[in-house]
Amino acid sequence: MKYRTCLTTLLYSFLLGLILPASAQNSLQHQKDSLRYALEHAEGIDKLQIYNKLYYIYMAEAGDDQKMDTLMTLFEQAEAEAIRQGDTQMQGMVYGNRIISYINRSEHDKVIEKAPAYLDFYIRHDLWKFYYQIHMQLITAYNLKGDYELAAAEAGKMYTRARERKDKAGMATALYATGIIYNLQRRPKEEEDCFRESISLLWEVSGYDNILTQSYAFLCVSLRAQARYDELLQLVPNMKKPSPASRKPPAGCSPKLGEIFMWH
């Protein structure tokens, strides 16, 4: 499993949905028109939620330059409305989705330019789940440009902040990011150590199933690279255990208000 290939597949899988039959295109346009009409009459949090739904639709079409331009305009409008209402959570979500849109289009320099200010915003307003998600995207941008030293420096910052807060999910995310850097550098033993520690922490929290699943996948890759096949097979029973999220409800906000839109 090559990280770059897998990551590219994840980031661009949404493009498969761009070639749609006319009926589907008409349905999307109808949704857009309905949401734009609703925007004219909405107020308060309802208006922010409508912006949220509308730009989600355009994010799925961001491979088209014209749709990307429209999406950026929507982000600007949603940001202005969130600032007007004093809703820092929705403002932070706009910033995060803007970064995801740049990543999905391989605009890595844009991510590197914009992300640091957004990370500062998340820190000031205690939006830590957003912070970890978008710090991961900054690290991803450096990785995809081959700037592994800068990627490692950012992962180190993430881990330090999480450790200071005794935030196990944040520490696990930073270790996951570091493990990916070692994978790209073909350092399987260090990669293994990072993913083992990340997995150990993730089993103590909920709401991070995607990172937990991918950590197991990368751990298998690192063991295979070291020809430790018996240990690889021993991982299977652990991977079949119920996830942390199935043992207790995830912490945090509802999907509408608390999650950055991520392509999987």
Q: What is the meaning of each model-derived region?
A:
Residues 1-11:
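Bacterial N-terminal signal peptides that target proteins for export
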Residues 23-264:
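A "functional boundary" signal
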